[in-house]
């Protein structure tokens, strides 16, 4: 998601956003307040100190994100609480980061727990400078940070023990939550924490040799698994405050439309309804919020509203018309992301002409969007599963007319997100603030939870964009590509955002073209068109690779099939010696699957794909068939190269989850469509996500490595659909050029 954004660009982009006059927009932010640094020395014992109170005590040379006090709490009983600087929404980051810190701390893992950090600057991503979760960067960007935090905390505990026993710290060692000294002396971390927290924080610390790891690299159960499996884990949707009310919002059927007339008499008559409020929405639209005692009366009242919408001033997209426009646009000249000589196309012995269509897709997290806002005399408090609590908190301050430091963010566990919980405009958070503000103006002095239904979520916009690809490829009898003329048409997800001026170059959004450049050495001319469409779009799990990987990996199979080459051998030849991680992942998947060594049951075929995204490589070898005219995925064998596997069990889960989401893209009904400007889907009855009955058998294998870990939240998604499609094409002889699959 954020892998194309350079670390130097993100603070500049946010500074640009924050420098605007607050009167210009409700999302205006103030840079000085938002980026205020806070720090503290020592280990926190009991409750965390407020970081800003000890800012002047921070050791020179250490940022707040490098000091253990914000991240490690050791209770007298030895329980270690690790604060994570990311949102946990199913990817296992709470466990992974806690493992990394606990490894260097030599903590007793049975006494380790993890909690979310706040929007404070101490919890900023060490690369990007703000608190965010995205781009599969969590473990990748914080691996060294959390190792050093654990090592600093351990060094302080050793110093505390050395002072207590009046010995040199070099004579001491640690083991599972204890400091061990000469003569059999020992002290638990809980006994030493109070003294350790008063000591200076060491700037330079020695880290373990990876060969000495006892926790990192070990398949470990997640810290939150027990509560989740027993229904005890609370999510943002579960927040309950004294006197809390619930709001639902009636939004226009066409994006950007405004309210023309309203009859709310029937809605107000429903028992439990407290207010019906007209509020501003994202993209200049208007909506109507119903505030009530609970969700059911609020929903009943919303259903009872009689609303008329003015759609005269907004464009009304239509899926069929859009696709025709995209096809016309693909014929036009446009900016080039890559260039090459296309003259060999005219005389190429073999050619392929292909068009691919990828629909709009909803994120559809299991927990719909929600945000609880409490307005207080001191400012405001928000409870929300935010991927960027610093940005969302500052945006909330702008909407409420407060200073950023007057807004307190309580980051909640989230039930999935896939990119939807990080919007550069903080749209759903600002909406909740507008509801709370309007409720206060109506005389309501209570916390208000704004809750989206599944229908609100599916129809609410911010989709993966519709994309059209066209490719004309010339190649010889050996499969050597002589020329590849490629056109991509699709909305830019960064256009109109704070990131546009930094990450859209020459009219080309880099997130749209990722996956078309590497790893294969191809003479490609790539033309890109980004049309303006009245559909809000956003990054979606694995971003551009959701469509580019499919195009590249299915076309490579087409070339291999046309030249009678084994698709694995063909890929290996193209990869050469320049991409050893791709080769290792692909070979591992091939070896573990039995590809080419054992016969498949009648009616089944192999499919292969390999793709790098977010600095990790995933290769799939799949078994598939066609039953009653429908494609069936039976088995998936994965080869994964993500460098050091911090928690192999979590990586296995991420690969499986991403693959199932990739499978969803292939299934009939997995598309958002428009007619006269309105979204035609509303729930899982007409918007398909894979069910348990669709899921294949999985085997996930990881290439051993001691190099620093790379991202794993998203890389398992892109190669699944092309591997599946390649297997079906082996059976039918016909390539699949459109998602979801159509075998008619």
Where in this protein do the model-derived segments appear?
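C-terminal catalytic domains of large/alpha subunits in multi-subunit enzymes
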Residues: 102-133, 160-187, 261, 269, ...
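Thiamine diphosphate
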Residues: 94-99, 394, 413, 417-440, ...
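N-terminal export signals
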Residues: 20, 27, 33-54
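Conserved beta-alpha junction segments in alpha/beta enzyme cores
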Residues: 55-96, 100, 233, 347-400, ...
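Glycine-rich loop/linker segments at domain edges
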Residues: 2-12, 121-142, 194-238, 335-371, ...
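Short beta-strand elements
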Residues: 70-74, 233, 371-375, 468-477, ...
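N-terminal secretory signal peptides
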Residues: 1-29
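N-terminal amphipathic, basic-rich helices that act as targeting or association modules
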Residues: 153-155, 159-307, 630-637, 642-665, ...
């Amino acid at each position: 998601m954020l892998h194309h954004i350079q670390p130097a660009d993100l603070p500049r982009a946010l500074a640009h956003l924050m420098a605007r006059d607050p009167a210009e927009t409700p999302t205006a932010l103030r840079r000085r307040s938002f980026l205020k640094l806070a720090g503290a020395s020592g280990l926190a014992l009991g409750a965390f100190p407020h970081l800003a109170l000890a800012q002047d005590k921070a050791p020179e040379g250490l940022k707040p994100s490098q000091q253990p006090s914000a991240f490690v709490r050791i209770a007298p009983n030895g329980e270690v609480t690790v604060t994570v600087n990311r949102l946990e929404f199913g990817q296992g980051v709470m466990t992974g980061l806690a493992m990394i810190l606990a490894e260097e701390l030599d903590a007793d893992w049975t006494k380790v727990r993890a909690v979310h950090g706040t929007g404070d600057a101490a919890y900023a991503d060490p690369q990007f400078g703000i608190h965010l979760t995205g781009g599969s960067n969590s473990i990748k960007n914080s691996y060294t940070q959390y190792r050093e935090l654990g090592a600093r905390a351990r060094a302080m505990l050793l110093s505390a023990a050395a002072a207590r026993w009046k010995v040199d710290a070099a004579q001491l060692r640690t083991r599972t939550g204890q400091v061990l000294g000469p003569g059999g002396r020992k002290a638990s971390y809980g006994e030493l924490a109070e003294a350790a927290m008063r000591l200076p924080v060491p700037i330079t610390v020695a880290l373990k040799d990876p060969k000495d790891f006892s926790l990192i690299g070990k398949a470990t159960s997640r810290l939150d698994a027990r509560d989740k499996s027993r229904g005890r884990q609370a999510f943002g949707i579960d927040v309950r405050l004294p006197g809390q009310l619930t709001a639902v919002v009636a939004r226009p059927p066409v994006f950007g439309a405004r309210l023309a007339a309203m009859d709310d008499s029937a809605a107000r008559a429903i028992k439990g309804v407290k207010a019906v409020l007209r509020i501003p929405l994202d993209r200049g639209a208007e909506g109507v919020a119903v505030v009530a005692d609970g969700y059911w009366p609020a929903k009943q009242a919303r259903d009872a509203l009689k609303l008329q919408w003015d759609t005269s001033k907004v464009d009304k997209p239509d899926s069929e018309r859009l696709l025709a426009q995209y096809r016309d646009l693909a014929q036009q000249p446009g900016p080039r992301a890559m260039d090459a000589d296309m003259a060999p196309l005219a005389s190429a012995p073999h050619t392929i002409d292909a068009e691919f269509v990828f629909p709009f897709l909803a994120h559809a997290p299991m927990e719909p969007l929600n945000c609880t806002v409490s307005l207080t005399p001191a400012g405001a408090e928000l409870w929300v599963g935010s991927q960027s609590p610093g940005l969302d908190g500052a945006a909330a301050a702008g909407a409420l007319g407060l200073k950023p430091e007057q807004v307190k963010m309580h980051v909640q566990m989230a039930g999935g997100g896939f990119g939807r919980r990080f919007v550069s405009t903080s749209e759903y958070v600002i909406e909740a603030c507008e509801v709370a503000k309007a409720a206060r103006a109506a005389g309501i002095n209570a916390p208000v939870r704004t809750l989206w239904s599944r229908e609100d979520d599916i129809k609410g916009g911010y989709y993966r964009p519709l994309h059209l690809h066209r490719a004309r490829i010339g190649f010889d009898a050996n499969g050597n590509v002589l020329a590849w003329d490629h056109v991509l048409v699709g909305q830019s997800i960064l256009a109109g955002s704070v990131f546009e001026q930094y990450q859209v170059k020459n009219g080309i959004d880099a997130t749209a073209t990722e996956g078309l450049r590497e790893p294969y050495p191809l003479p490609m001319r790539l033309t890109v068109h980004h049309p303006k469409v009245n559909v809000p779009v956003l990054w979606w799990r694995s971003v551009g690779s959701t469509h580019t990987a499919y195009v590249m990996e299915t076309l490579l199979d087409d070339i291999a099939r046309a030249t009678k080459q084994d698709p694995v051998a063909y890929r290996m030849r193209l990869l050469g010696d320049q991409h050893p991680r791709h080769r290792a992942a692909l070979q591992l998947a091939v070896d573990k699957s039995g590809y080419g060594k054992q016969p498949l049951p009648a009616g089944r075929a192999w499919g292969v794909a390999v793709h790098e995204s977010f600095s990790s490589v995933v290769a799939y070898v799949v078994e598939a068939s066609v039953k009653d005219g429908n494609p069936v995925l039976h088995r998936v064998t994965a080869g994964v190269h993500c460098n050091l596997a911090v928690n192999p069990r979590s990586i296995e889960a991420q690969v499986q989850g991403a693959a199932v989401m990739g499978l969803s893209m292939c299934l009939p009904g997995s598309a958002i469509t428009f007619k006269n400007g309105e979204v035609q889907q509303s729930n899982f009855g007409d918007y398909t996500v894979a069910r348990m009955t669709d899921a294949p058998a999985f085997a996930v294998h990881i290439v051993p490595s001691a190099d620093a870990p790379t991202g794993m939240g998203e890389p398992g998604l892109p190669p699944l659909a092309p591997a599946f499609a390649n297997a079906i094409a082996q059976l039918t002889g016909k390539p699949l050029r459109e998602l979801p699959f159509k075998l008619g």
